[in-house]
Amino acid sequence: MSNLFLKRVGFSMVLGMASLQAMAASSDDFVDAATEAGIAEVVTGKLALDKSKDPQIKTFAQQMVTDHTQANQKLGDIARKLDISVPDEAALTEKVKKMILKWRDESFDRSYVNNQVEAHEKAVELFRKEAASSDKAELKAFAGETLPKLEEHLKHAKELQAKHGQ
């Protein structure tokens, strides 16, 4: 098995952590999945800021860190208001860091942009479903408000993928 394949699989695991929960019906599952995906975006965005040499990828990564940090904070506030438990950020951050510990620089940009597309496709699906069918008005509103930003991220990630990915 090639090193590149193993890196892509590892990266997919990090950014696709919420993929199985994306189809979950409960508000608790949405909070868990969205929190896990959001934290993974922040951690990998910070890693891209450190490892990428490309200014466009660094700009995108900074946007991911900023936008997902804000969304994570807002989601956490809503979840606490609704008395929904929020996954432990420190534990999730550590989980993500352990999965990416062995990455090397040689194909980082390609792996990062390819998996940003995959992660944002899953996030758009998750948030679209919650915006359409949540039983909690606050989560429905949050998902609906956040969805356009995620769609913008997906569009930008696809543009970067056309240049650096595949």
Predicted feature descriptions by range:
Residues 2-166:
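His/Met- and acidic-residue-enriched segments that coordinate or traffic transition-metal cofactors
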